[in-house]
Structure formats: C-alpha cells, structure tokens
Curated annotation (Swiss-Prot):
Domain of life of the source: Bacteria
Sequence positions that bind substrate: 7-14, 20-21, 59, 86-89, 97, 113-114, 182-183
Gene Ontology terms: biological process: gluconeogenesis; glycolytic process
NCBIfam families named among the record's database cross-references: pgm_1 (TIGR01258), PRK14115.1 (NF010713)
Pathway participation: Carbohydrate degradation; glycolysis; pyruvate from D-glyceraldehyde 3-phosphate: step 3/5
Active site: 8 (tele-phosphohistidine intermediate), 86 (proton donor/acceptor)
PROSITE patterns linked to this entry: PG_MUTASE
Name of the protein this chain belongs to: 2,3-bisphosphoglycerate-dependent phosphoglycerate mutase
The reaction(s) this protein catalyses: (2R)-2-phosphoglycerate = (2R)-3-phosphoglycerate
Keyword Iron: no
Top-tier EC class: isomerase
GO molecular function: phosphoglycerate mutase activity
Species name: Listeria monocytogenes serovar 1/2a (strain ATCC BAA-679 / EGD-e)
Length: 229
C-alpha cells in the first residue's frame, strides 16, 4: 500500500519569511510551479489515487488541485479538514522570522519553531487574528480552536483524524494522497515512523515535493522516498 504526502508549494508568506500558521495566504508563483511539477512527477511515476485529503487553507487546497489536474485525476474525491491545518503559530503569525530572532534571540525562536512541546506566545482573546472570527471555523466548538500550538498539540489533532478517517480508507485498499502543511505533516510522519520528540526537531519537509510511503498491513512504513527528480 502506498501513501503520498505533499507539503503545499511555496506560499506568499513563505517567500517573505513570515510566520504563517492558520493565516490564509495564497501560493506564490514559485509555489504554483512546485505544485504543478509535483503533479507531473506523480503522473510520470504512475501513482493513482482514489481519495484525497487536505486542510481548509487555500495554499494546501490549491496545491492539491494542481497535483490532481497535472496527474489527470481531477475527479478524485477531496475531503477538507481543519485538523490538517498548519500548526497555529499564535501571536507569532504575521511576524518576520529574522526580525523575531533578532528581538527574542535565535535560540528562543528556534524552540518556538522546532521544539516538540514549547508553545509560541498565544493570541490574546480579543486579537482580530483569532480563528473564531473566520467563517470556516464557525461550526467548531470554540474550545477546539487554538490560540497557539506546539507540535505536540498539532499531533493531538492530526492523529485522531488519521486514525478515524484516513487510515480506514487505506485499510479498505484505497490509494490516498494528503496535501497539507509542514508541521501537520511532521506530526503525521512522527507518528508513522515513531520519531522521538528530540529527533523530530531536525525533520524538514520540503515544499511541493511528493513523499511516497510504502506501508505494510499495519500501516507501518517499510520504505519511503521523495519524487524529487
């Protein structure tokens, strides 16, 4: 069984080196090219899908659309869930990463970005950036909407969705592609591979490059590779 993971193509805020999180930004032109290239590589590799999953953020949705279009699979059913959203960067969202490092120190910012269990500064309740002000989250319990997340909290929302919704599809023999985000995919990869809390700090997933897992009957990876050429 194969599972394909794709981090969205470069976004406008990736290009500007800004913390993005749940803020909804579009793909950059380079990101569009990355997504289209991913779709072409998937087609060349002969990978076919029966069902697709993505977040409710534009950059991931558009990446999936380009991938399916370029691989001639636009008809594949797509399921969108906030549980596949990027990690919520709290009050860091919208800030420049370099300027934030100069203000708080590179070590502190690295902990906010990469540590498994260090929370970023949280959004204030009345901050206009609160996701509860966004119509796409209106049906969610307000207690489920974060004001900031570390990777541990991100994993705690991603893995139940994997276990309850995505994994059963794979066990039924359906071929799955997931287009999501750097940290929601890092959370899933940590779970699939059993990566330690310390080792996950060093894991980087490139934008727009399909990551193919070959899974056994227990959905444990037996092989993985990137479609990067």
């Amino acid at each position: 069984m194969k599972l394909v993971l794709i981090r969205h193509g470069q976004s406008e805020w990736n290009k500007l080196n800004l913390f993005t999180g749940w803020h909804d930004v579009d793909l950059s032109q380079e990101g569009v090219v990355e997504a289209m290239t991913a779709g072409k590589r998937i087609k060349e590799a002969g990978l076919e899908f029966d069902v697709a999953f993505t977040s409710v953020l534009t950059r991931a949705i558009k990446t999936l659309n380009y991938v399916l279009e370029e691989s001639d699979q636009m008809w594949v059913p797509v399921h969108k869930s906030w549980r596949l959203n990027e990690r919520h960067y709290g009050a860091l969202q919208g800030l420049n990463k370099q300027e934030t490092a100069e203000k708080y120190g590179a070590d502190q910012v690295q902990k906010w970005r990469r540590s498994y269990d260090t929370l970023p500064p949280l959004l204030e309740e009345n901050d206009e950036r609160q996701a509860k002000n966004d119509r796409r989250y209106q049906l969610l319990d307000t207690h489920a909407i974060p004001s900031g997340e570390n990777l541990k909290v991100t994993l705690e929302r991603v893995i139940p969705y994997w276990m309850d919704t995505i994994a059963p599809e794979i066990k039924e023999g359906r071929r799955v592609v997931i287009a999501a985000h750097g940290n929601s995919l890092r959370a899933l990869v940590k779970f699939l591979e059993g990566i330690s809390d310390d080792e996950i700090m060093d894991l980087e997933i490139p934008t727009g490059v399909p990551l193919v897992y070959e899974l056994n009957a227990d959905l444990k990876p037996v092989n993985k590779y990137y479609l990067d050429k």
